[in-house]
Amino acid sequence: MHCAQYTAGRCRSCQWLDKPYPQQLADKQHHLESLLAGHAVTQWLAPVFGRESTFRNKAKMVVSGSVERPLLGMLHRDGTPVDLCACPLYPPSFEPVFTVLKTFIARAGLTPYNVARKRGELKFLLLTESTYNGELMLRFVLRSETKLAQLIAALPWLQQQLPQLAVISANIQPVHMAILEGEREIPLTEQQALPERFNQVPLYIRPQSFFQTNPPVAASLYATARQWVQEHEVHSMWDLFCGVGGFGLHCAGPETQLTGIEISAEAIACARQSAEQLGLKNVSFAALDSTRFATAEAQIPELVLVNPPRRGIGRELCDYLSQMAPKFILYSSCNAETMAKDISLLAGYHIERVQLFDMFPHTSHYEVLTLLALRR
């Protein structure tokens, strides 16, 4: 993959771009195998990968420059703006959208936030595309509500220029820190969920819910989880840290008792919408802390699926799972190092199979799916 900004030394987000892609995959696999070297693994499966470019469904653009000539991209470590509108990770459909958005910023008078001076209003633009129907979700991250009326007044022009814009919102982030978004989200369209579909499973993305950024590889990850679970004829399961419900909704059959837990109420609203559309009657989702929920339960399902943030599931939940001893633990991780630490705490389990999913080409990051089975 060629990137002009990388070649010019302006962007180093893809820190492995100089490394041939087969070597990237081999290095990631070696890293994963070294982390699990102290454990017997019954089956290692070949890494799953997708496209090397144009795979991202989401752009997080810092807005800088002037209101008349806004720049979208990132700030270099020396504080100068780097234009990322032509970033090769984005689908080709994004660049013309960015062109329209620059014009809109000027028309609406949305002054870009100046980090050095701590002045201005528009901090970020967050753009997400559905691979299911091409609809877009756009979030304006503002320092305050000062320019909100101007933004709303100018929206009809933007919607006319970009009819694929289905979900629009404003997020208020008043803090002068490198924080992407604030807690307050103001919906600006009636529709507030972007429909997505992986493997015939309807999923929904709301403004403040997490969703994978590499749809083709994410679809493979969910399909693999479903296959592994179905092979063991599981009738009851928990989906902890469930997000919008992607894993649980893939794995649950009509008779499966599924409980999905996620701290984000936005994500839970998406999961419930999907479950209703699928007609699943034995499924429930709740906006709770996953560890608090699990450790308060006296009954354990046959399988516990965990998909934690980078910190892993931690000692408390590992100790609880070891004590309650579900037959299977399906662990999906975006940080294999914390996953390996957690597995070391689950001494009553052996690793049945492991597979790497390269969700983040040209970086050292990857996802991994691991099936743990209770030792007989």
From Swiss-Prot:
S-adenosyl-L-methionine binds at Q212, F241, E262, N307. GO terms for biological process: rRNA base methylation. [4Fe-4S] cluster binds at C3, C11, C14, C87. It holds the Pfam family tRNA_U5-meth_tr. The active site is at C334. It is an enzyme of class 2 (transferase). GO terms for molecular function: 4 iron, 4 sulfur cluster binding; iron ion binding; rRNA (uridine-C5-)-methyltransferase activity. Keywords: 4Fe-4S, Iron, Iron-sulfur, Metal-binding, Methyltransferase, rRNA processing, S-adenosyl-L-methionine, Transferase. InterPro entries: 23SrRNA_MeTrfase_RlmC, MeTrfase_TrmA_AS, MeTrfase_TrmA_CS, SAM-dependent_MTases_sf, U5_MeTrfase_fam. It catalyses: uridine(747) in 23S rRNA + S-adenosyl-L-methionine = 5-methyluridine(747) in 23S rRNA + S-adenosyl-L-homocysteine + H(+). Catalyzes the formation of 5-methyl-uridine at position 747 (m5U747) in 23S rRNA. Belongs to the class I-like SAM-binding methyltransferase superfamily. RNA M5U methyltransferase family. RlmC subfamily. This is 23S rRNA (uracil(747)-C(5))-methyltransferase RlmC. It comes from Yersinia pseudotuberculosis serotype IB (strain PB1/+).
